[in-house]
């Protein structure tokens, strides 16, 4: 049997001609990533290894983004600790306040990940870079420490699931709706330790921002990684953001998949994930009358420029409902500046929304929009577990920027078509 995209990348980085699902391998790493929560633990473990330098100062990225700008003394101490480590080791890609952004939006923008890479990150949504045709996956801080020291990591080669995307999505349907539709279909463990491989002629109708959102949420189906075939849009994106050489891996015709799904994108509707699982989905025409207290538009899933443009399209000339707080968080400084230059901030502020500096912030219940007991939020983030954004008795509804913006105006979960 042949190999999938993921299996080919892993085989090449392990120096092997072929790998099979379940095989344990040791592969070379192109990037090791950590943030302000996971890196302090990794640094402590790194010290225990007994080495005095990292394997490559250019192949490590440290992004303080979760509690940044520092929300309290403890978070300030954490960032100080990893800042000093980055300086000591000469790590090139340490992104301070003013340069930093939400890590999984920042690394592709900076050209640090290209097709065919193997990337590990001490953050579960590291799978985002599969949008570029890379193998990327989340790991723990101990593996980050070992990766920084050796430039290698061990993997169990995953089985694969194939998602053949067909047709063209309709108005207001984005990558977020498509991945919520898929997770609703297969469940939060439907792709457990498998690679989700996205292909088909429908991929051409998805922007890179759509693909980043979909790969980002592969972990919400339990996947080891999500990965898209490289096409002209990918190549154009990489050309614009990176000067690195790269290799494109295509699946063999006889590659083996444990399951294959065909998704007609024209039939996918705007979709909302109800509490408390990303798989608890309903289409927008079946949500009922759910009043809300807060809307958050941002995160590593939906804080990119296209997301903000869609939100602005919905909010333009309208007002956020008097009972709703609307918080908009561009994912990086570059996106923030672009949104400002395009006049999107005027639209947001005139509508009554607040615009934040780039940060993960409320997504993980960190800061910049914590929920109180009994409050409901519509968020363009990726997780709606109990207590994820604040009080354990609050509720989170996951949606696209279009639905989130419309809900901010309506005061309840709803569609832009209702405005």
UniProtKB/Swiss-Prot annotation:
Its cofactor is [4Fe-4S] cluster. It catalyses: (2R,3S)-3-isopropylmalate = (2S)-2-isopropylmalate. NCBIfam families: hacA_fam (TIGR01343), IPMI_arch (TIGR02086), LEU2 (TIGR02083), PRK00402.1 (NF001614). Gene3D superfamilies: Aconitase, domain 3. Catalyzes the isomerization between 2-isopropylmalate and 3-isopropylmalate, via the formation of 2-isopropylmaleate. Heterodimer of LeuC and LeuD. Its EC number is 4.2.1.33. This is 3-isopropylmalate dehydratase large subunit. It comes from Acetivibrio thermocellus (strain ATCC 27405 / DSM 1237 / JCM 9322 / NBRC 103400 / NCIMB 10682 / NRRL B-4536 / VPI 7372) (Clostridium thermocellum). Pathway: Amino-acid biosynthesis; L-leucine biosynthesis; L-leucine from 3-methyl-2-oxobutanoate: step 2/4. The gene is leuC. Binds 1 [4Fe-4S] cluster per subunit. Pfam families: Aconitase (PF00330). Coiled coil: none annotated. GO terms for molecular function: 3-isopropylmalate dehydratase activity; 4 iron, 4 sulfur cluster binding; metal ion binding. Belongs to the aconitase/IPM isomerase family. LeuC type 2 subfamily. One of its GO terms (biological process) is L-leucine biosynthetic process. [4Fe-4S] cluster binds at residues 300, 360, 363. Keywords: 4Fe-4S, Amino-acid biosynthesis, Branched-chain amino acid biosynthesis, Iron, Iron-sulfur, Leucine biosynthesis, Lyase, Metal-binding.
């Amino acid at each position: 049997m042949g190999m999938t995209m993921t299996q080919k990348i892993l085989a090449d980085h392990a120096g092997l001609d072929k790998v099979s699902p379940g095989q344990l391998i040791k592969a070379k790493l192109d990037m090791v990533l950590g943030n302000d929560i996971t890196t302090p633990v990794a640094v402590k473990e790194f010290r225990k290894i007994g080495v005095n330098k990292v394997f490559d100062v250019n192949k490590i990225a440290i992004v303080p983004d979760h509690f940044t700008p520092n929300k309290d003394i403890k978070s300030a101490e954490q960032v100080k600790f990893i800042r000093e480590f980055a300086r000591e080791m000469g790590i090139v890609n340490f992104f301070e306040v003013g340069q930093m952004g939400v890590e999984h939006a920042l690394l592709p923008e900076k050209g640090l990940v290209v097709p065919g890479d193997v990337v590990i990150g001490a953050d579960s949504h590291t799978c985002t870079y599969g949008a570029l045709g890379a193998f990327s996956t989340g790991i723990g801080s101990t593996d980050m420490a070992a990766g920084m020291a050796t430039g290698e990591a061990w993997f169990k080669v995953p089985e694969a699931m194939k998602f053949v995307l067909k047709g063209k999505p309709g108005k207001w349907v984005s990558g977020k709706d498509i991945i919520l539709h898929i997770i609703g279909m297969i469940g939060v463990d439907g792709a457990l330790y498998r690679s989700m491989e996205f292909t088909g002629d429908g991929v051409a109708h998805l922007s890179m921002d759509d693909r980043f959102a979909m790969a980002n949420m592969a972990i919400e189906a339990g996947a080891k990684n999500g990965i898209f075939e490289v096409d002209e849009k990918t190549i154009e994106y990489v050309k614009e953001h990176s000067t690195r050489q790269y290799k494109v891996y295509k699946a063999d015709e006889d590659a083996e998949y444990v399951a294959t799904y065909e998704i007609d994108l024209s039939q996918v509707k705007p979709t909302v994930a109800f509490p408390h699982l990303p798989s608890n989905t309903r289409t927008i025409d079946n949500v009922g009358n759910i009043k809300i207290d807060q809307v958050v538009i941002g995160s590593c899933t939906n804080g990119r420029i296209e997301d903000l443009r869609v939100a602005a399209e919905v909010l333009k000339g309208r007002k956020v409902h008097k009972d709703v707080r609307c918080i908009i968080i561009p994912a990086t400084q570059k996106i923030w500046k672009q949104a400002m230059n395009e006049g999107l901030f005027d639209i947001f502020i005139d509508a009554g929304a607040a615009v934040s500096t780039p940060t993960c912030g409320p997504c993980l219940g960190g800061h910049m929009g914590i929920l109180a007991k009994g409050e409901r939020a519509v968020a363009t983030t990726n997780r709606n577990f109990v207590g994820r954004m604040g009080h354990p008795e609050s509720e989170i509804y996951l949606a696209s920027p279009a639905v989130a913006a419309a809900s901010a105006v309506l005061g309840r979960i709803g569609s832009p078509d209702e405005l």
